[in-house]
């Protein structure tokens, strides 16, 4: 038979150990919740950066398109001036400008095609990243709810102990 005093001390020691474990867990849970929030924020920022880069590609493509339109307008002006000129030197100079502008247009259109391909890939990447982000946010929401529920349970256990 165990002495009643020793038995009471063992029960007290068990409660103290339980209280210490619950207190440690209760202190850890807010950090775990914050870590979930931080991960959601980091993934959201990464997604936003991908969207921004994709939008920038489209903006660059539109700028090139405007440059092409500008060059085409310049070619039309040069051709109009060419019809009005009477000197061979002026005609040749305008012809050279037209050829130069046409080469620039070809280079710009090549760049525009590359940007269109990059934009299409960017849109696909954004769509995929959005699906992944939404799935992660849903998973994180459940994990956070579980952690908060666990924190409430630990608090209740701590009060009961």
For the regions a language model picked out, list residue spans one by one.
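Short, charge-rich amphipathic alpha-helices with coiled-coil/heptad character
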Residues: 1-55, 127-143
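Short coil/loop "hinge" linkers that interrupt or connect long alpha-helical coiled-coils or helical hairpins
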Residues: 4-7, 11, 62-100
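Coiled-coil termination/hinge junctions
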Residues: 140-161
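Non-transmembrane amphipathic alpha-helical segments
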Residues: 19-22, 29, 43, 50, ...
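Long amphipathic alpha-helical coiled-coil segments
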Residues: 73-74, 108-133
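Alpha-helical coiled-coil
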Residues: 32-84
């Amino acid at each position: 038979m165990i002495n009643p005093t020793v038995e009471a001390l063992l029960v007290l020691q068990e409660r103290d150990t339980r209280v210490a474990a619950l207190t440690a867990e209760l202190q850890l849970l807010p950090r775990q919740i914050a870590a979930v929030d931080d991960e959601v924020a980091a993934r959201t920022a990464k997604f936003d950066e991908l969207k921004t880069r994709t939008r920038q590609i489209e903006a660059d493509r539109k700028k090139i398109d405007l440059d092409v339109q500008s060059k085409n307008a310049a070619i039309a002006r040069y051709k109009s001036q060419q019809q009005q000129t009477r000197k061979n030197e002026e005609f040749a100079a305008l012809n050279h400008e037209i050829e130069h502008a046409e080469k620039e247009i070809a280079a710009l259109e090549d760049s525009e095609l590359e940007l269109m391909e990059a934009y299409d890939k960017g849109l696909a990447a954004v769509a995929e990243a959005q699906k992944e982000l939404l799935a992660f946010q849903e998973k994180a929401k459940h994990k956070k709810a579980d952690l908060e529920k666990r924190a409430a349970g630990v608090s209740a256990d701590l009060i009961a102990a």
